[in-house]
């Protein structure tokens, strides 16, 4: 029988344990493998002998002997190959272990070098610290001696000051007491003045509130009047819009009646003359109204100046006089002046509106005449 071919064993995995332990484990594995191989060889030889003994005389021919020799040689070749593979694996493992040991030796050498450098630096620092400590001890001794000298001099100076400046200090203390008494009296006067100022401020605030209330009432009346004027302005705008619409309608009718205008040319010329006379009369009226407006503006300016003077006089009299009757009289005067001012302002605005209406009507007439007589 041919012996089974031994399979090539896998290379052992690298262990992360230290190199000495791995080397011992590898040696143990190799020894165990050698013992197993020897036991296997002995078993194979025993099987071969048993096979030879069991053969018959006929089978023990030359051919059988050659076959057995060939098988034996093949087994020996396999054994030698396996041993050579094992030796090669051992060499590779030893080379790896040697490389790891060399790397560790280099690392340890670098660590030793760094540690030597660190110890050298520590020695240098220790020497500098020792020198600094000696200097500090010397400085401390010098400071103690100087401190003792300065204390002795300070005691001497204290004795001299107490003997020389005692009377002067007493005089200064008396002056300080006088000044403190005077300061207290002045603070009392200051408090009384503050109270008076507070009372005056309260009175002034009350008067100011009264004046503000009066001004607010006047402002309310003024706002009401302005709202009325705005409503009037709105109505005038509506009337103007209606007039514009009427003008648009008139223009439409004018386009439709363009043929009839030729027949009524004579009547239109007469109307033109009448309109011219009317425009002349209205121009004169406008000039008169403008003169009246100027007079009213002058009156307004005079009234404004009188109002300003009255307000100033009212403020002065309100500050000087505390009686309520005088304040009411002045307030009545101010109200009368304000009413006169408002009436004059309304009259001036009415005249201005009337003059503007006359001017707008004159412009409309001129526009109609231009359309009629291009």
Curated annotation (Swiss-Prot):
Entry annotated with the keyword Lipid metabolism: no
Keyword Transferase: no
Annotated region (Disordered), positions in chain: 1-38
Domain of life: Eukaryota
Record-level GO cellular component terms: cytoplasm; nucleus
Subcellular location: Cytoplasm; Nucleus
UniProt keyword annotations, A-Z: Coiled coil, Cytoplasm, Nucleus, Phosphoprotein
Record field: compositional bias (Basic and acidic residues): 19-32
PANTHER family assigned: COILED-COIL DOMAIN-CONTAINING PROTEIN 89 (PTHR34768:SF1)
UniProt record similarity statement: Belongs to the CCDC89 family.
Record's subunit section: Interacts with HEY1.
Record-given protein name: Coiled-coil domain-containing protein 89
Species whose genome carries this gene: Macaca fascicularis
This protein's encoding gene: CCDC89
């Amino acid at each position: 029988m041919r012996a089974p071919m031994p399979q090539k064993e896998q290379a052992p995995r690298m262990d992360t344990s230290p190199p000495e332990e791995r080397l011992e484990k590898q040696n143990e594995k190799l020894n165990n493998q050698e013992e197993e191989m020897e036991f296997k060889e002995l078993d194979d030889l025993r099987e071969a002998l048993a096979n030879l003994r069991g053969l018959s005389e006929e089978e023990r021919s030359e051919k059988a002997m050659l076959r057995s020799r060939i098988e034996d040689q093949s087994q020996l070749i396999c054994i030698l190959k396996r041993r050579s593979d094992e030796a090669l694996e051992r060499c590779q493992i030893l080379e790896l272990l040697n490389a790891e040991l060399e790397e560790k030796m280099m690392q340890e050498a670098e660590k030793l070098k760094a540690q030597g450098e660190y110890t050298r630096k520590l020695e240098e620092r220790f020497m500098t610290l020792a020198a600094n400590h000696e200097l500090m001890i010397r400085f401390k001794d010098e400071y103690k001696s100087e401190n003792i000298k300065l204390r002795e001099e300070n005691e001497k100076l204290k004795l001299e000051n107490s003997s020389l400046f005692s009377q002067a200090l007493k005089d200064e203390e008396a002056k300080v007491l006088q000044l403190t008494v005077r300061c207290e009296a002045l603070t009392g006067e200051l408090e009384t003045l503050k109270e008076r100022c507070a009372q005056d401020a309260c009175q002034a605030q009350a008067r100011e509130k009264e004046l503000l209330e009066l001004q607010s009432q006047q402002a309310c009346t003024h706002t009401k009047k302005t709202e009325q004027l705005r409503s009037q302005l709105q109505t005038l705008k509506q009337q103007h819009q209606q007039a514009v619409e009427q003008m648009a309608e008139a223009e439409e009718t004018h386009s439709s009646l363009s043929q009839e205008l030729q027949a009524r040319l004579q009547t239109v010329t007469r109307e033109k003359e009448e309109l011219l006379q009317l425009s002349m009369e209205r121009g004169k009226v406008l000039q008169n109204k403008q003169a009246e407006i100027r007079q009213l503006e002058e009156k307004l300016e005079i009234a404004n100046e009188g109002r300003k003077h009255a307000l100033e006089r009212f403020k002065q009299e309100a500050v000087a006089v505390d009686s309520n009757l005088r304040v009411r009289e002045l307030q009545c005067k101010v109200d009368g002046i304000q009413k006169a001012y408002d009436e004059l302002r309304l009259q001036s605005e009415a005249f201005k509106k009337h003059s503007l209406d006359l001017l707008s009507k004159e412009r409309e007439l001129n526009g109609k005449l231009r359309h009629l007589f291009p």
